[in-house]
Structures are given as C-alpha cells and as structure tokens.
Amino acid sequence: MLIAIWAMTQEGLIGNNNTLPWMIKQELAHFKKTTLFQALLMGRKTYESLPKVFEKRTIFLLSKDQNYRFEEKGSEVKVINDFWPLIKSYQANKEKDLFICGGKSVYEQTINECDQLIVSIIKKKYKGDQFLKVDLSKFVLNEVVEFEEFNVNYYRKKQQ
C-alpha cells in the first residue's frame, strides 16, 4: 500500500530552504510514530534535511547519482534512481506499506498513485519557499485527529 505523509500549512507551505518552517514536537512525534519500522521513499534533499539520527526505518533514497554517498543516520538506505518499479511492487502487495515522504517533486509525481494520505495541517502561518497543491478529489476524508497546533487528516482513495 502506498501512503503519502506530510505536514503543511493551510496555504500549502511545506518547506523553507530545504527544512521545515516550524518545529512542533507533537507533529514530529506523530511522524516518528507513524513511520518507525516502515519503508520510506524520499528525495535526496529531504534525506539530507533529516536529523543526524533517523533510525529504524528502511529508506529508498531517490537520487540521479546512483553512486551518491549518503551520510549514515541509523537506517538502512538504498539509493535508487527510478522509483516507479518500487511503486509498482508496493501497489501489487497490499500487505506492505511504503510511505512517501517528499520532497515536493516526489509528492507531485506519486500522490495520485497513493492509497492513503496522512496530512498534518499546521494551524499557524509560516513563511517559506516550497508549496504543495494537492487535488484531493480522488480521496475521501476518513478521520481528523485534532492537536493544539495542528490537525492530522487521514484520507483514503475513493473506490473506482
């Protein structure tokens, strides 16, 4: 199963200078709890923005450079230069989950393939340079979990 997970403001802001514009401990804890011991797909810049310790996950790191030398952060990392075979393998096996974790171009290319979306909506306004516009017409809002500084919206793909 393919699951995209990200945080954004109500205006669609997802980043600033390759980092999160906010530091909300509860939201980071939600991301950690959701993705721990899971397989993640992310781009090189997203990987480089992770904390020094980011362990107990399998990371498929998308890079044009197949020989990319990544900094070890405590997770198993596999460098790939084409994510479509990976996407297809997880679509064919609904018993295993692959979490799409960014950045912007990875989300834009994969969201329509996802079975579920987990979107943290940050309540406060922030400044930044990366915005994500998502067409949610193919998804149904399944659940909203409210926190003080953000809400987590859980979407599932509409049945065809």
Swiss-Prot record:
PROSITE patterns: DHFR_1, DHFR_2. CDD domains: DHFR. NADP(+) binds at residues 6-7, 14-19, 43-46, 62-65, 101-106. The keyword NADP applies. GO terms for molecular function: dihydrofolate reductase activity; NADP binding. Pathway: Cofactor biosynthesis; tetrahydrofolate biosynthesis; 5,6,7,8-tetrahydrofolate from 7,8-dihydrofolate: step 1/1. Its EC number is 1.5.1.3. GO terms for cellular component: cytosol. It catalyses: (6S)-5,6,7,8-tetrahydrofolate + NADP(+) = 7,8-dihydrofolate + NADPH + H(+). InterPro entries: DHFR, DHFR-like_dom_sf, DHFR_CS, DHFR_dom. Residues 1-160 form the DHFR domain. GO terms for biological process: dihydrofolate metabolic process; folic acid metabolic process; one-carbon metabolic process; tetrahydrofolate biosynthetic process. Keywords: NADP, One-carbon metabolism, Oxidoreductase. This is Dihydrofolate reductase. It comes from Mycoplasma genitalium (strain ATCC 33530 / DSM 19775 / NCTC 10195 / G37).
